[in-house]
Amino acid sequence: TLPYTGRAKEILKLYLTDFTEDELNYCVEGAYKKSSFSSEKIAPLYKISDKESILELWRGPTCAFKDMALQLLPYLLSVSASKTLKDTKIVILVATSGDTGKAALEGFKDVDNTQILVFYPVDGVSPMQKLQMTTQEGNNVSVCAIKGNFDDAQSGVKSIFTNSEIKKKFAENHLAFSSANSINWGRLVPQIVYYVSAY
């Protein structure tokens, strides 16, 4: 039986057809390293009866299931950017109501050629989530509390993505936008891995 990383590579290569084997190895082994997950099985499956099992998706660095995707996304994005956006820094904009923010900050911290900015509603996250985000280490991480709710944060991020003047100014300065929210395919494809792996 293949370990989780082996299953991840086999599944991801079906979707990421423009990634080489070495690139997939780099992404998967970097994302799911033992120092980031509390179980070497990454997403252990425990049988509790003949018909029921429990899949643990909380073994990552922030104890949120979103770590499963947000540990891999920075690697996928970096490899993709090296092919298509040479000499460009990727600015990751994220709207969160809690878990996504911390998991994205943790995933992207200190990743070369990236900057991440997380927007969260000032009264819309728990005190623990706020503390996790506002104390995040990393030389490329920032958080911004907004007045309003999650929908307001998300609308603000979308308006930045669609503002042609902002995009033009960023492009002139060798900057490009991306997202760590679930609109990004790189957030979704890692989820396929743990569903298939559990099966």
What are the language-model segments listed below?
Residues 1-199:
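PLP-dependent amino-acid enzyme catalytic core
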